[in-house]
């Protein structure tokens, strides 16, 4: 069974357990070396509601250590019974965190106007030698999304916006900016001496 099929099987097995706890499955990550590590990311319904309404802060309802521990026991027992992994494996259950990774393009829809850090599987077809992009998410379609790149994250002669197909993405992560009361916004120095 390949990784994608394995993740789909695990999703079907554990989603009812997570929903029964009043939580939501955010994503699953598999690491196969040197032994399988199954990372399960779960979120609270309240946190998802706040994100849907563009309210993102560190004071929103957080999943507790007790909830993660309880789910870890339930999920661990389920995976043992199903015998999906023939050898020793490790299970980790946690919140996605403020700087969360995205597992589907649909998850991006709640984060318009937020900064995203993206690594591609290979060089972007229109940006030679570029696999990494950091910018503000400005739009999403069915299969693509667009980032606005400040001068701090591009050369002055490069386009401001980059369109990325989700199938190209190796990893996409939300960038959380912690509030700094004495820092003036919009004063990041650009590569060519300008400010953004």
From Swiss-Prot:
Alphabetically ordered keywords of this record: Cytoplasm, Ribosome biogenesis
Domain of life: Bacteria
Cysteines joined through disulfide linkages: none
Compartments reported by the entry: Cytoplasm
Chief localisation class: cytoplasm
The UniProt record lists the keyword Transferase: no
InterPro entries: Ribosome_maturation_RimP, RimP_C, RimP_C_sf, RimP_N, RimP_N_sf
Cellular component, GO annotation: cytosol
Keyword match Cytoplasm: yes
Pfam family name, one: RimP_N
Any one biological process term the GO annotation gives: ribosomal small subunit assembly
Function in brief: Required for maturation of 30S ribosomal subunits.
Family: Belongs to the RimP family.
Name of the protein this chain belongs to: Ribosome maturation factor RimP
Provenance organism: Lawsonia intracellularis (strain PHE/MN1-00)
Gene it is expressed from: rimP
